[in-house]
Amino acid sequence: MKSIILFVLSLVLILEKQAAVMGQKDGSKGQLPSGSSQFPHGQKGQHYFGQKDQQHTKSKGSFSIQHTYHVDINDHDQTRKSQQYDLNALHKVTKSKQHLDGSQQLLNYKQEGRDHDKSEGHFHMIVIHHKGGQAHCGTQNPSQDQGNSPSGKGLSSQYSNTEKRLWVHGLSKEQASASGAQKGRTQGGSQSSYVLQTEELVVNKQQLETKNSHQNKGHYQNVVDVREEHSGKLQTSLHPAHQDRLQHGPKDIFTTQDELLVYNKNQHQTKNLNQDQEHGQKAHKISYQSSRTEERQLNHGEKSVQKDVSKGSISIQTEEKIHGKSQNQVTIHSQDQEHGHKENKMSYQSSSTEERHLNCGEKGIQKGVSKGSISIQTEEQIHGKSQNXVRIPSQAQEYGRKENKIS
């Protein structure tokens, strides 16, 4: 408690001394003439200490009226010099920002040149915006994750007072085919590609914008024609014997175009074309044969129900095409179609579990399950190199199995 009371009293004394000194300083400004040279100039250096040092000096009682007058003049001069220094620093900062902008512009141009050399056939997006006669060009290549994503997405938005035009840029050969891993995982799936390109144009360049629009339309039409031709080749590569009864994946091309037309003073046109193409690069073939049930009547009113569930050959063929190169497929004929009657006849005679009772009123149930061959053929073509087809026939039951008779 005593320490707190002493601290409060010391603060009160300091505040009273400061109030007295400030009152004396205000009263002395009108009394002192311009003869400030009566006091030594060595005292001028003391005003460079902070306000804290001044308060500390005032608390000791060593602060004089004349010294306060010198401090006021020097503070005014120092304030003027500080403002001038701040202006110089601001000017230097402005020059530094301009220098950084110029360096960034050069780096962007260099990056654009390198990316243009490396990205032939890739998607690349150019963002140009003009402000005050200076153009900042940036080039970005969308990342193509060939393991997880079907295509890359590039998106850039720059906002300024000029016009924005969006369109779909040229499709490359790399986009025509995804990676082998992605195709192996998704059979018969669709592959879509979205490329969004933003370009901010100067208002006076109407002819250049119109020319670019026509070029984009022509290139887009060529891409659609190439995709249709590619899909047609894939359809012709299927085997005629299985083509009528196989369930194919999506091979059609679905193209959607959303055009947003925005007109400004010079009637520039803003286009946004979104393209969603589903490529028919895979053929997924599954053939089934229906099960049949035959009932036989044996001697003396006996009934024998023979169920012959013959599952036909399941032929799964996957054809993968990369870089527009196609390879014809060899389709394996189903054994149940070619030799259906023989297999059924043999399965009736040599079924696995057959029960026959020749007595009157007894029933015999014959059940035979014969599974056909399962043929899986996978053909992968990567960069013009094809792999040989693998054919794995598997039969669940032998035809020469003995009959088990239970009386």
Curated annotation (Swiss-Prot):
InterPro entries: Semenogelin. Participates in the formation of a gel matrix (sperm coagulum) entrapping the accessory gland secretions and ejaculated spermatozoa. Residues 292-310, 335-345 have a biased composition (Basic and acidic residues). Residues 25-60, 133-158, 173-192, 272-407 are annotated as: Disordered. One of its GO terms (biological process) is sperm capacitation. Belongs to the semenogelin family. Its main location: secreted. The lineage of its organism: Eukaryota, Metazoa, Chordata, Craniata, Vertebrata. Interacts with SERPINA5. Residues 31-40, 137-158, 174-192, 325-334, 372-397 have a biased composition (Polar residues). Residues 1-23 form the signal peptide. It comes from Pan troglodytes. This is Semenogelin-2. Keywords: Repeat, Secreted, Signal. It comes from the Eukaryota. It is found in: Secreted. GO terms for cellular component: extracellular region. It holds the Pfam family Semenogelin. The gene is SEMG2.
